[in-house]
């Protein structure tokens, strides 16, 4: 969780509106994360992010990031046992640029634009191709000081609606899939114990804003199901799908609530030099 935590160089991912409140003029970060290393040794996520504050007033900033996810080498075998098969190297990447600005002393907003490229295909199949899409994030951040237990604490709130954009296709536009659009809301509190020790608590709620894929009914023919699938899922626009995602769960309102993922984070910091962090994440099975 991080939509409402204090600004840092990696805010581009969680909430780019936080860049407007960054203390430093600029920052750059590079990270490399092995993925499922106990199962495979060549799957990893690389992430590069940075920002720069514009002007002398420090009320606005630009940010950018590059994400590259390598799925390693995947062996593909033919149905014919006599054919040797081959190896593919699927990967996905996203490049985005954001602009953030303080709208008041305590409130900021940001817009991010993103290009997504996903190459999961194998070239031997001419019907399958790499997919690309464009998306945008809309983010807000509010921070202020409040008095708790006679101490000045930093209370912050954040919102980020991410990956609002076009659909992505892997077959030259014959069929297309929704991007993983998300709505993330959060709050955080920094409580100074004394001049050297600080406790931070953060909380996030995340809603997947993609419509539920219809399930074929017991008395429904395949043709009837495919017609309903096109009408209620395949042919609707991404924007309509966002609104539909709040009311289309088969289990009604209870299932809509179960779709929300919850995250809780706790951080202890000593003298702004040493930190210990822990968190808990929950989502319905």
Language model: regions and residue ranges:
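Subset of outer-membrane beta-barrel
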Residues: 1-285
């Amino acid at each position: 969780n991080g939509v409402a935590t204090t600004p840092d160089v990696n805010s581009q991912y969680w909430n780019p509106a936080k860049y407007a409140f960054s203390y430093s003029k600029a920052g750059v970060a590079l990270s490399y994360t092995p993925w499922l290393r106990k199962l495979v040794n060549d799957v990893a996520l690389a992430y590069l992010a940075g920002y720069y504050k514009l002007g002398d007033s420090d009320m606005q900033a630009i940010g950018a990031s590059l994400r590259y996810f390598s799925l390693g080498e995947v062996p593909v075998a033919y149905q014919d046992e006599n054919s040797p098969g081959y190896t593919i190297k699927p990967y996905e990447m996203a490049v985005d640029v954001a602009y953030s600005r303080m709208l008041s002393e305590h409130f900021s907003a940001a817009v991010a634009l993103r290009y997504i490229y996903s190459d999961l295909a194998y070239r031997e199949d001419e019907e399958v191709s790499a997919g690309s899409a464009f998306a945008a994030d809309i983010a807000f951040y509010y921070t202020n000081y409040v008095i708790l237990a006679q101490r000045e604490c930093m209370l912050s709130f954040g919102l980020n609606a991410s990956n609002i954009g076009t659909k992505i296709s892997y077959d030259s536009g014959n069929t297309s899939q929704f991007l993983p659009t998300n709505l993330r809301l959060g709050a955080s509190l920094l409580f100074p114990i004394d001049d050297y020790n600080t406790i931070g608590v953060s909380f996030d709620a995340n809603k997947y804003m993609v419509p539920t894929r219809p399930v074929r009914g017991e008395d429904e023919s395949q043709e009837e199901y495919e017609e309903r699938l096109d009408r209620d899922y395949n042919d609707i626009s991404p924007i309509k799908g966002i609104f539909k995602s709040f009311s289309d769960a088969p289990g009604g309102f209870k299932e809509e609530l179960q779709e929300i993922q919850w995250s809780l984070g706790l951080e202890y910091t000593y003298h702004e030099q040493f930190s210990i962090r822990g968190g808990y994440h929950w989502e319905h099975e």
